[in-house]
Amino acid sequence: MQRIAMFLAILGAGASAVLTGGCKSPPTQSEMAAYDYGPRPENYEKLIRDYLFNKLLDPGSAIVEFKAGPRQLFQQETTLRPLRYGWGVCVWINDKNTRGVYDGPYPMVFFIRDGKIVATNGGPDDNIIGWRYARTGCNELGAPFWTP
């Protein structure tokens, strides 16, 4: 009985940390301005397509839609994600699964600085937290993503 109580206490503490760990107030303009975003990337579409080539199951038939950006994007550090900033680009991707069928689009956010992708949210190798950050990032960039 004591083991069950201890397990439930640990489970409750972990769930509480996950649910509240990602919550922070939005960054202020001065916080965002304190970082060097570098020059606005001109070749962002090529950078992103090259990045995705090794990540997607079928990159040749994947549908990649550039929805918003590049715009300066700042993501505060939380217990779940490190600080991320750069030129943000929201992309919606529809890739084929292992059966050769399109699964439906999902959002990704790319952070680009000094001509390189320095971080991403969402995507095939990210977790559910990253997918949530991708939706939030796309929303901030002006391309809200929702699942019908």
What do the PLM-derived regions correspond to, one by one?
Residues 1-9:
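Bacterial N-terminal signal peptides that target proteins for export
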Residues 24-148:
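Cystatin/cathelin-like cysteine-protease inhibitor module
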Residues 19-22:
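C-terminal motif of bacterial Sec signal peptides marking the signal peptidase cleavage site
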